[in-house]
Regions:
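Acidic donor-binding segment of Leloir-type glycosyltransferases
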Residues: 1
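Acceptor/aglycone-binding surface of glycosyltransferases and processive sugar-polymer synthases
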Residues: 4-19, 24, 37-119, 146-155, ...
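Short beta-strand-to-loop acidic/aromatic patch adjacent to the donor-nucleotide binding site
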Residues: 23-33
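Conserved residues at the C-terminal ends of beta-strands
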Residues: 28, 56, 142
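Catalytic donor-sugar/metal-binding loop of nucleotide-sugar-dependent glycosyltransferases
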Residues: 90, 115-117, 126-144
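DNA-recognition element of transcription regulators
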Residues: 123
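C-terminal, non-catalytic tails of nucleotide-sugar-dependent glycosyltransferases
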Residues: 163-173
């Protein structure tokens, strides 16, 4: 798939979901931080009990091979606090883990209502899932931090805060 210009991660994933086929639709970050060896098991769980499975690095069973730099961890902790209290997603302490898997009809329904084009699209999706009463499973992951990440802490954090506040203000339905 190609976009004309950089429209944002949320836009790109929404575009991909729009053309995807199959009984399950998912996405994983392209930077190879998250191990996907559990995918066959997760697909079985989607066929049974769950509508959506989200990777969660905060779960005790998760295996983190490289710890984040302190300033990145502090920023992450502040973000989690805001997600919990500004948008009411306390039951999802790791909204930004780039490992999510949906039943296809659930993905189409959620992404049909999702509007955020940037990185905070995950937050909006989880709000929509929660308000729709979907069955969501948090899944521990095997994850490797990238000390050479292209994320710019100051400008990226400000952009993400703007998107997060817009989501909190708009209250997706």
């Amino acid at each position: 798939l190609q976009n004309l210009g950089n429209r944002g991660k949320g836009y790109s994933v929404r575009h991909g979901v729009g053309v995807a086929s199959g009984a399950a639709i998912g996405f994983i970050d392209a930077d190879d931080k998250t191990d996907i060896s559990s995918l066959p098991t997760l697909l079985e769980e989607l066929r049974g009990s769950y509508d959506l499975i989200v990777g969660d690095r905060t779960m005790p069973e998760s295996q983190i091979s490289i710890e984040r730099r302190p300033y990145r961890q502090w920023g992450s902790d502040l973000f989690k606090y805001l997600v919990r209290y500004a948008v009411g997603l306390g039951e999802f302490p790791d909204t930004q883990c780039g490992y999510k898997l949906f039943r296809a009809e659930v993905a189409r329904e959620l992404f049909g209502r999702q509007r955020v084009d940037g990185y905070m699209f995950d937050v909006e999706l989880l709000i929509l899932a929660k308000r729709s009463g979907l069955r969501v499973k948090r899944q521990p992951v095997v994850w490797r931090d990238d000390p050479d990440s292209r994320f710019k802490p100051l400008s990226g954090s400000l952009r993400n805060m703007r998107e997060l506040l817009a989501i909190a203000w708009r209250r997706p339905r």
